[in-house]
Design a protein with these regions (language model features):
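N-terminal auxiliary segments of SAM/dcSAM-dependent transferases
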Residues: 1-13
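Class I SAM-dependent methyltransferase Rossmann-like catalytic core
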Residues: 7-10, 20-50
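Conserved SAM/SAH-binding loop-helix junction
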Residues: 40, 63, 67, 98
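Conserved class I S-adenosyl-L-methionine
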Residues: 50-61
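Conserved SAM-binding loop of SAM-dependent methyltransferases across substrates and taxa
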Residues: 61-87
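S-adenosyl-L-methionine
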Residues: 95-152, 163
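Switch II (G3) loop of P-loop NTPases
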Residues: 157-162
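C-terminal substrate-binding/active-site "lid" region of AdoMet-derived donor-dependent transferases
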Residues: 163-197
């Protein structure tokens, strides 16, 4: 696990060009960003595994997605020489329709339309429909389910606000394959006066 979570020293740790542009837009829109070190670490972890089915919960404006597309479907000639371990299917869950349009453009820019898709629903709707589909088709293999999410999930990245992160993480464990991976930012540690104990 330590190797999986360690920094990839052979990989350029600078922000990919497309992700950098999206980050600038986020700053202008006052949208909070994951720290660059966290985005790079998520990308580094994803470079070491070969997930069949992956999902990003909380696509936002596509900032973290751009980091992962740069890994899995590089568009520059320099990155084009690298071996990619992209998933067979990737679903990006984002309830904001305008953000979904931006993510859809990102998918097309990276020529990932045959394996990546954005779903314009909130996570609670997606998980409810998926669990319902699994329950009503209990006799068939998970991979044959007709659901928004490709099953079973081998990689889940939760990129939501701290208030929503815990509930999303708890609900996703039911869908993760044995040996699958769930990546999310740990809760912020309280600082200052915490009151009487």
């Amino acid at each position: 696990m330590a190797i999986l979570l360690s920094e990839d020293t052979e990989r350029d740790q600078s922000e990919p060009e497309v992700a950098s542009s999206i980050g600038e837009q986020m700053l202008h829109m006052d949208i909070p960003l994951l720290p660059r070190s966290i985005r790079a670490r998520i990308r580094d972890v994803c470079s070491r595994i070969s997930p069949k089915n992956a999902v990003i919960i909380g696509g936002g404006i596509g900032h973290l997605s751009a980091w992962l597309f740069d890994l899995w479907s590089p568009i520059s000639s320099e990155n084009g020489k690298m071996k990619t371990n992209r998933p067979e299917s990737l679903r990006i869950i984002e309830p904001g329709k305008r953000f979904c349009i931006i993510i859809d453009r990102l998918i097309r820019r990276y020529d990932a339309g045959d394996w990546a898709q954005v779903i314009s629903m909130n996570w609670q709707e997606v998980i409810a429909e998926t669990i319902s589909s699994r329950a009503s088709n209990v006799s068939i293999d998970e991979s044959a389910l007709n659901s928004d999410l490709p099953m079973p999930l081998d990689l889940v990245v939760v990129d939501l606000s701290e208030d929503d992160r815990v509930d999303a993480a708890k609900s996703v464990f039911e869908l993760v394959s044995p040996g699958g991976l769930v990546l999310l930012l740990e809760p912020t540690v309280p600082t200052g006066d915490v009151g009487e104990i």
